[in-house]
């Protein structure tokens, strides 16, 4: 499909955390093609000025890959924990920012910024905090310029670019 072709062309830099045991089992070389299966994690890094949400992939399995193209696929289910924010890009495209809380073991949750596009953006903008959703997308990285009192600084944002999303339940269900 055209949407999956876009995913094949986009280059994203993703931070991966790997246990030493997994690395010891497989010698890595720079620019090696890898298959990483794992969980997306988030935490607030409070060091330095301003809070910064850090998004990583915690590798459960890692292996060398002989696939002819890279595949960046994420499947999530969780709960909207902030009101959706519908906006228009400078190119005139509708996008909606969502914050998804994804529960994991031991009462912890990961908070993952997600973006829907076009007609889906307009639809998801109407959803309420507490709505349960399931989605498919990719973990994307994008550069942006942050203007500070001391000048402009280039930063990288990590977010889930949503390909498909469905509402599992509304807050009052």
Language model features: what each stretch is:
Residues 19, 41, 81, 101-103, ...:
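Solvent-exposed residues in well-ordered beta-strands and their adjoining turns
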């Amino acid at each position: 499909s055209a949407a999956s072709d876009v995913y094949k062309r986009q280059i994203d830099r993703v931070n991966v955390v790997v246990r030493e045991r997994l690395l010891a089992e497989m010698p890595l070389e720079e620019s090696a093609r890898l298959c990483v299966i794992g969980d997306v994690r988030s935490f607030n890094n409070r060091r330095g000025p301003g809070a910064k949400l850090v998004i990583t992939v915690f590798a459960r399995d890692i292996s060398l890959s002989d696939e002819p193209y890279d595949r960046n696929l994420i499947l999530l289910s969780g709960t909207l924990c902030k009101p959706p924010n519908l906006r228009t890009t400078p190119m005139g495209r509708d996008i909606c920012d969502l914050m998804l809380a994804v529960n994991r073991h031991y009462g912890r949750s990961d908070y993952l910024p997600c973006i829907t596009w076009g007609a889906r953006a307009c639809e998801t903008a109407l959803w309420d905090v507490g709505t349960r959703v399931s989605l498919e997308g990719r973990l994307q990285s994008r550069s942006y310029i942050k203007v500070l009192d001391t000048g402009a600084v280039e930063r990288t944002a990590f977010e889930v670019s949503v390909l498909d999303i469905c509402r599992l339940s509304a807050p009052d269900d």
